[in-house]
Design a protein with these regions (language model features):
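Class I SAM-dependent methyltransferase Rossmann-like catalytic core
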Residues: 1-34
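Class I SAM-dependent methyltransferase SAM/SAH-binding core
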Residues: 34-89
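Hydrophobic beta-strand segment of the Class I
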Residues: 99-100
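A short glycine-rich, Lys/Arg-flanked "PGG" loop and its adjoining helix->strand segment in the class I
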Residues: 112-127
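Conserved class I S-adenosyl-L-methionine
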Residues: 127-152
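Short alpha-helix
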Residues: 149-172, 176, 208
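Conserved catalytic loop of SAM-dependent methyltransferase domains
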Residues: 170-195, 203-205
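C-terminal lobe and adjacent flexible extensions of AdoMet/dcAdoMet transferase-like proteins
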Residues: 194-230
């Protein structure tokens, strides 16, 4: 079930959300250090992680699923968000270079179809980055944050799902190794706990970050089934 966009925004407006965004942005940037000239699409509630690419990527757009709702973004300039069904993206085939999924895979009732649609809009060799709640983490079991909603995953589950829809996993990282508590002193120490956790406790990180590439050859993913709208 998709979370309400207002609840997602409220989380990222709080100190714990700002801390999570700062730490997770760093892992995303480490995997995608330069998107100059790339066409970037965020799907789900990815806008907290897209701003760092404004002015660098050739084009940035954000799709928020209809069941979630939409928020205008960015605050300044022309709006870059649109509302759409996650299995019927409003983009031509092979028109996107990079896709970032955040608060998406775990919420969709049709995750395989959604990945099939991402495969369709990505160009040859295009890259997909997934941020999903880690089933083994405390974050995935506490509903006080968005990462505690929906279906959490293991790395193996995500890898198999990606391969079944025509993607080759390339890189894996972890983030959010501090516990999801809102105590101010705890959050101030979060960067330090993140460094310690990355050394010793990565299996229990809050989220799994996986980069994958669109595979052009071999088995092609089935076309998503179009469902009649009510």
């Amino acid at each position: 079930m998709w979370q309400d966009v207002v609840d997602l925004k409220d989380f990222y407006d709080r100190e714990i959300g700002r801390t999570a965004r700062h730490l997770l942005r760093a892992r995303i940037r480490a995997l995608w250090p330069d998107l100059t000239g790339q066409r970037l699409l965020g799907l789900g509630y990815a806008t907290p992680y897209l701003r760092q690419f404004l002015g660098e990527a050739e084009r940035v757009a954000a799709v928020m699923p209809a069941a979630q709702g939409v928020m205008p973004w960015p605050r300044e300039g022309l709006g870059m968000t649109t509302l759409a069904d996650e299995t019927e993206l409003p983009f031509p085939d092979n028109s996107i270079d990079r896709v970032l999924l955040v608060h998406a895979l775990e919420s969709s009732e049709h995750p395989s179809d959604m990945l099939g649609e991402v495969w369709r809009v990505l160009g040859g060799g295009g890259r997909l980055m997934l941020v999903v709640p880690n089933r083994r983490s405390l974050w995935s079991h506490l509903e006080r944050t968005p990462f505690g909603h929906g279906q959490p995953f293991t790395q193996g589950q995500v890898t198999r799902l990606l391969r079944s829809r025509g993607f080759t996993p390339l890189n894996t990282d972890r983030a959010l190794l501090f516990w999801p508590f809102s105590w101010r002193t705890w959050l101030r120490a979060a960067p330090g706990w993140e460094r310690i956790g990355r050394r010793w406790f990565t299996p229990f990180a809050g989220v799994i970050v996986i980069e994958a590439m669109k595979q052009l050859y071999g088995a092609q993913p089935a076309k998503p089934v179009k469902r009649r709208r009510a």
